[in-house]
């Protein structure tokens, strides 16, 4: 783990405790796993990875923890279509990125683009909206699946 992921997990646990939430094994397991990720995961993927690590966490607990983390602003919910929601940590001052989703194999990749960010900021200026945040999900076929189309 990097210092940033360690500090995110530690800060998240400390903040939740300060709000009166118990430091349950499920909560700690989900937070630690999310802190190690480069991109977003579904609740099922989180559950599967925790079980593979030998953590005894129920799927309902994973959903409850993710809901609380989302409500408290520690994770971002990302709707990638087809009724699938993914979750990833929100790092204070960290890298902002968007997502590419392959409609064929389901692969999700993160990407950042300074020109896209500038274009989105211009929209804020033109419309007069005070934009609190945004997420861009681009759908299509990944490098592996595109040749088969």
Where do the language-model regions lie?
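Pre-recognition alpha-helix immediately N-terminal to the DNA-recognition helix
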Residues: 28-33
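Short capping segments at the starts of secondary-structure elements
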Residues: 25, 36-42
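Short, leucine-enriched amphipathic alpha-helices that occur as contiguous helical runs
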Residues: 9, 26-27
């Amino acid at each position: 783990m990097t210092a940033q992921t360690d500090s995110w997990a530690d800060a998240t646990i400390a903040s939740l405790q300060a709000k009166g939430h118990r430091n349950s094994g499920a909560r700690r397991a989900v937070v630690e796993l999310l802190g190690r990720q480069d991109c977003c995961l579904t609740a099922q993927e989180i559950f599967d990875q925790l079980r593979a690590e030998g953590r005894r966490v129920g799927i309902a607990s994973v959903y409850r923890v993710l809901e609380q983390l989302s409500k408290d602003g520690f994770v971002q919910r990302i709707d990638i279509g087809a009724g699938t929601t993914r979750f990833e940590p929100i790092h204070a001052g960290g890298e902002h990125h968007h997502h590419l989703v392959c409609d064929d194999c389901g692969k999700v990749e993160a990407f950042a683009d300074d020109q896209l960010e500038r274009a989105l900021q211009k929209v804020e200026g033109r419309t007069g909206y005070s934009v609190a945040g945004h997420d861009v999900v681009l759908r299509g076929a990944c490098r592996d699946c595109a040749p088969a189309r």
